[in-house]
């Protein structure tokens, strides 16, 4: 039979460190990660679609709004009354209730608040939207 044993020293030290490449190399920048996500969204969920919507006009959402290039969302959804009715980077801000139905659009969600995913799912699911079919979280 085989026997398990304990090695004398760690074989791999997997900790957050300022020396990690992902912490110091510009190739790992948030902008580059968003560019990668945009590319794969274009190859998957957004492929063949003439329009989509973005949920989120906060700090995370604005970063996405600045960087959409070939495709831009038709609108951006937010729940802040000071933002709704305005334009951010040329894109109109709407209330969630103004979204087209689940079979009419796709929604990319760019909200970084810790409780946002569950709150947004709680709004989307009862209205017939299904994650990955009708919407996807980006952040």
Can you name each region flagged by the protein language model?
Residues 48-68, 76:
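Glycine-rich adenosine-cofactor-binding loop
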Residues 11-12, 19-20, 57-61, 81-82, ...:
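Short, solvent-exposed loop/turn segments at secondary-structure junctions
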Residues 81-139:
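Phosphate-bearing ligand-interacting subdomains
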Residues 68-72, 123-126:
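Short, solvent-exposed amphipathic alpha-helical segments in soluble enzyme
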Residues 45-49, 69, 99-104:
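Flexible, charged surface loops at secondary-structure boundaries
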Residues 5, 51-55, 108:
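Conserved beta-strand elements of the Class I
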Residues 16, 63-66, 118-121:
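Short glycine-/acidic-enriched loop or helix-start segments at secondary-structure transitions
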Residues 9-18, 23-48:
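Catalytic core of nucleotide-sugar-dependent glycosyltransferases
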